[in-house]
Amino acid sequence: MLSIHEKAQDEMITDAVAAFPDECCGFLFGREVGNERIVTMIQAVNNAKEGDKRKRFEISSKDYLEAERFAGENNLSLLGVYHAHPDHPAIPSETDRMAALPNFSYIILSIINREFAGLRSWRLNDEQQFEEENRSKPVLP
């Protein structure tokens, strides 16, 4: 089960709409309690993809290292990554699957014509295929 604090969800949506028509990206921070992952904050990062950023995103290894450091210094867990799919549904592509790390949550936001159209979260299963995560409604901190 994935729970997202309302403020974190609002920040992801704002980032995704502002980046349109490009894909935005960032990190999910929070904590794990039993089988529940609770996203308490996000951190937007620069889409490091060279060239056309409308259909692809990339997070630099430097940003990953800084995110791990930030999580450790703030007693948080790095739970995963979010990114937007401009004018496409919130379903992972094969490129998303190939770049995915095990145990991470991957939130995809669908932005259609500069409007938020929905979000879904995914995790790799044992066969390295994406499965949709169950989510609770946005929660207040």
Language-model features, listed with the residues they occupy:
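Conserved beta-strand-loop surface patch within small alpha/beta domains used
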Residues: 1-78, 87-141
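Residue-level "edge-of-site" marker
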Residues: 84
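Conserved, mostly hydrophobic/aromatic
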Residues: 81
